[in-house]
């Protein structure tokens, strides 16, 4: 696959898109909290990959880490202009639901709430911590693949992820203290759930 992509074979790029477009879109969605922006980032990622195909190393495994690395940088750039739009999504809970479309709209609103909550947690992390967390935890890359995607050492991936988890755990403790009278026994906050998600170990 790598040799075919590097050679500019359109069939290889079609296969790459089919296998990885969903992962790229979902990764961009988690980082930006906006469906439309995530779609744009997905398209831009593959366009950038096509233009940079000659830099692909013919040795190696899946190209997914490479694509997610491109998407990460584009998403972080897009985040700067998305704060007002994320706030809009969070306000949709107050939008009346038309009966004929109630299930679809209600599902969309629920997704918007979750995305807004995730964005609130991610916004409290530093950019480098946020990038590593989303790649390792949500996009399912192992430490080595995340290092490849971001162009940093594996040790740096581990340390940044550790700091991100520690901060999320601290945020969860703070949130629990503020809402303790209303919290259910054993109930996890969004930050605690994020901090507890596992990371895939390196593949052999």
Specify the residue positions occupied by each region the protein language model found:
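Short helix-capping/turn signature of helix-turn-helix
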Residues: 19-22, 31, 134-142, 151
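Sigma70-family region 2
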Residues: 6-7, 30-33, 44-61, 81-83
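Acidic, proline/glycine-rich intrinsically disordered inter-domain spacer in sigma factors
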Residues: 95-123
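Helix-turn-helix DNA-binding module
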Residues: 40, 120-131, 139-156, 167-170
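C-terminal edge and immediately downstream basic/flexible tail or linker adjoining helix-turn-helix-like DNA-binding
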Residues: 4, 87, 93-94, 148-149, ...
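A short, charge-rich alpha-helical start-of-domain segment used by transcription regulators
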Residues: 3-26, 50
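Arg/Lys-rich amphipathic alpha helix in sigma70-family domain 2
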Residues: 51-58, 69-90, 94, 103, ...
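Residue-level preference for hydrophobic side chains embedded in well-ordered alpha helices
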Residues: 16, 20, 24, 28, ...
């Amino acid at each position: 696959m790598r040799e075919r992509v590097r050679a500019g074979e359109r069939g290889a790029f079609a296969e790459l898109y089919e296998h990885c477009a969903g992962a790229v879109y979902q990764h961009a969605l988690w980082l930006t909290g906006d469906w439309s922006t995530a779609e744009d980032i997905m398209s831009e990622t593959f366009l950038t990959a096509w233009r940079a195909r000659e830099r692909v190393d013919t040795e190696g495994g899946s190209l997914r880490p490479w694509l997610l690395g491109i998407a990460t940088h584009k998403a972080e750039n897009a985040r700067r202009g998305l704060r007002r739009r994320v706030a809009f999504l969070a306000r949709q809970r107050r939008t009346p639901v038309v009966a004929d479309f109630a299930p679809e709209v209600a599902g969309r609103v629920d997704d918007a709430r979750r995305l807004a909550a995730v964005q609130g947690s991610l916004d409290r992390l530093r950019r480098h911590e946020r990038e590593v967390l989303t790649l390792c935890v949500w996009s399912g890359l192992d430490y080595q693949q995340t290092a490849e995607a971001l162009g940093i050492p594996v040790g740096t991936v581990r340390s940044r992820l550790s700091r991100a988890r520690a901060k999320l755990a601290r945020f969860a403790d703070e949130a629990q203290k503020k809402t303790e009278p209303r919290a259910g026994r054993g109930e996890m906050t969004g930050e605690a759930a994020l901090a507890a998600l596992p990371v895939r170990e390196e593949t052999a």
